[in-house]
Amino acid sequence: MPRNVPEVNGVYRHGACELWCRAMAHALLKRSGVRRGLGGREGPLKRLRLAVEDFVRTTSESEACESRSAVARSRPGGRKSRKELRKEKRHLRKARRLQRTVGSGSGDQGGNVGLNDGPETRRPPTEVRPTPAKATATPAKASAPSTNTKASAAQPKAKAKGAPGKPGPATATARKRALLAANEEEDREIRKLERCLGLHKRKKKGDGSSVPLSFARDGLDYILGALECGSGGGLYESSEEEEEEKLETGQTVLESDLESNSKESEEDPDWQVLQEDQEDVNSKRRGEAESGTRGNKGTKKVRFAEVVEKSRSSSEDDIEQQESHSVESGEKYIPPRLRNEEVIDVHKKEELDRLKKHVKGLINRLSEPNMASISGQLEELYMAHSRKDMNDTLTTALMDACVTASAMPSRLMMEHVFLVSILHHTVGIEVGACFLEAVVKKFDAIYRDGGEGKELDNLFTMIAHLYNFHVVQSILIFDILKKLVGTFTEKDIELILLMLKNVGFALRKDDALSLKELITEAQTQASGAGNKFQDQNRVRFMLETMLALKNNDLRKIPGYNPEPVEKLKKLQRTLVRNAGSGSETRLRISWDGILNAEQTGRWWIVGSAWSGTPMIDNSHHIQLQKPLAGMASSKMLELARKQRMNTDVRRIIFCTLMTSEDFLDAFEKLLKLGLKDQQEREIVHILMDCCLQEKTYNPFYAFLASKFCDYERRFQMTFQFSIWDKFRDLENLPDTKFSNLVHLLAHLLRTKSLPLSVLKVVEFSELDKPRVHFLRRVLTALLMETEDDDLAVIFSRVSDNPKLGMLREGLKLFIGHFLLKHTQAHQSAEEASLLREKAGLASKSLQGKAILRM
């Protein structure tokens, strides 16, 4: 075939070849002297023309078939380079110029003959289906199946193309080497990207491929199973199946290429001829492909299912091998959820570090002058952060600052504990409770280990100051002292002296009976010790200190100076005046209750099980009640029956009250009964009834009632409700009960056991004669028997509450109109003058604390 015949997409155009042959025949005729109109020699010329046309037709058919198969083998991608396309365009333009030259130089007869025979040359030849080109090699990597897939998908396109000639073995070998080199280059690029991403592969046993460890952690190892060596065929088969489905619907790769190049071929008439021929060929091919596809579709699906099962089994083996590898190497699988928590923990840790630095800086600058500002900043931190984080951070900072191997200065120790008491009253009782638990547990741990440093002294001093600043009640202090007296070593004696020096007189004021029992037990231990101690002076000094506390002799306690504590207490009242933590903020918890908080629950948290622990073992309380009932004499039981004590609980309470030595003894015995909520209220009711039944007023009941009111708020509320019940029935009370009730209420108001707001139920606008008489006697006793400072505090407690406005106005009106109007008639001049002075002080206190200062 001549070289100047144009080629389009690897297929020689039939029309150009035909024109070239006609031009050559016309040139031969001109050389032989043949002219139009010569009829003598027309027969040989006609035979020559037919022979040339037959030769052109057979040659074009055979070469077109060979070119299709050659192109399919030569070009795996199915597309030419830009250089080849430009070369084809040049040949096409040259063929067009030759066609125009031949058409203009030939005669009418020759041109008519050529045009009449044109459709015959465009008749589609008999199709010869070439065999698709097979893959020359199967690379080991996963990119080889994708390359073969592209080659197989390009087969239908290659069938419609021609080639200038059949490529030789050297060309096929070079093409094969180029493909292998491209695959190796692609593998090198993949390995380079994996190194950049840190996806290091792990060696696997057997035929399984390697999967990066990060993919296995993310759960993507089974997804990548389709790309492994054993499952690569699945993708190849699926791509062929998709191609066959496209053949069924008539969408071949060649058609898509023709559609994409339709705009370029609209202006080319020769291209339209080739497109028509190709459509005829494709119509025949579709019919054959439909029958072949229906037969092979089932087998391909079966093969693909086998490949999928194989990939699944291989992925399961990979997972097992990964797990065994992680166990052997000591690695632990971390789920994504836990990895997110690790990231969150990092941010949380950074935030806690900043909080610790801030709190530590405030603690380092702590002193009495800037106590208000530092406590205010800590309150803001409590509002900005969680309570748990702040409690832990503050407790750790204070423990690091105060618990050292050397003795801390007493002033510095008081200031740190004083800060805790301020936050305990302003923020909430959980602040002091958390700090108290940490201190007690630290003290118990060091005490059990037998620490020789001053850590025990510092911790013991902190507990003592927590009691001084009203964070904890005396029950914890007595528990610790009883524990130390029970062991009674030299270190215990030293700690007992330290505690009595700091809080001894406060303990005597709060619970003198328990202090008396403690002193008696200490004397017993000292007498039984004998020559146990090398230094007997220390034991003697401890006993002398205890006796000085018992006798209220301050001179015999060396180094006792209550002024710093009293000064800080006054500052505390200033800072926590408007605190909203409640009226009773002192924690009543025992030593065992704190140490067993893990089992019984932390009582300062709402819903904790601590409140129920004193009544867990009810059998113990029943055993206590029976001996008490048996110890009561028949005379006492008869007296209880006359007082209408018709239940066992009432009889036990009555007998306990009547047989006690003093109010402290009665208080302890009543608490040891372990009564429940409803049974505890019977204590108040029986106490009130016994007090009113006395022929003359007995202060025993008033002091006992004051002790119960200071012990728990629930007793205070029960006394308040009981007194309100008596208010409603004042006109029916006998004179004895009336007088006893006046003295009882005046005592409770004077000792601040009950607030002045207990009178808020009195309607001052509708007072009758019994109520006027009752209020005059109560207020007179309160004003005459109370000191000025205490009187100002009692009346000022109702001045700040807006809900008690009617009570304030009623009291001022009653004092001015009923109390001071007839003072001269019933009292002496001195008493009347003192009463008017106290009444003026009470009226100013009711108006507000600012007026009282002026």
UniProtKB/Swiss-Prot annotation:
UniProt keyword annotations, A-Z: Nucleus, Phosphoprotein
Disulfide bond entries: none
Keyword check for Nucleus: yes
Motif (Required for efficient binding to PPP1CA and for targeting PPP1CA to the nucleolus): 301-304
Ranges of residues in domain MI: 648-764
Complex formation: May interact with EIF4A1, EIF4A2 and EIF4A3. Interacts with PPP1CA and PPP1CC.
Domain MIF4G: 356-553
Native source species: Mus musculus
Gene expressing this chain: Nom1
Molecular function via GO: RNA binding
Biased composition (Basic and acidic residues): 188-197, 281-291, 303-315, 322-331
Subcellular localization, as worded in the UniProt entry: Nucleus, Nucleolus
UniProt-annotated stretches for the region Necessary for nucleolar localization and for targeting PPP1CA to the nucleolus: 2-275
Region described as Disordered: 66-215, 231-333
Comp. bias intervals (Basic residues): 76-99
GO biological process: hair follicle maturation
Modification sites for Phosphoserine: 60, 311, 314-315
Keyword Nucleus: yes
InterPro entries, alphabetized: ARM-type_fold (IPR016024), CWC22_splicing_factor (IPR050781), Initiation_fac_eIF4g_MI (IPR003891), MIF4G-like_typ-3 (IPR003890)
Bias-annotated ranges (Low complexity): 128-173
Chain intervals with Gly residues compositional bias: 104-113
Identification of the protein by name: Nucleolar MIF4G domain-containing protein 1
GO cellular component: nucleolus
Reported function: Plays a role in targeting PPP1CA to the nucleolus.
Biased composition (Acidic residues): 265-280
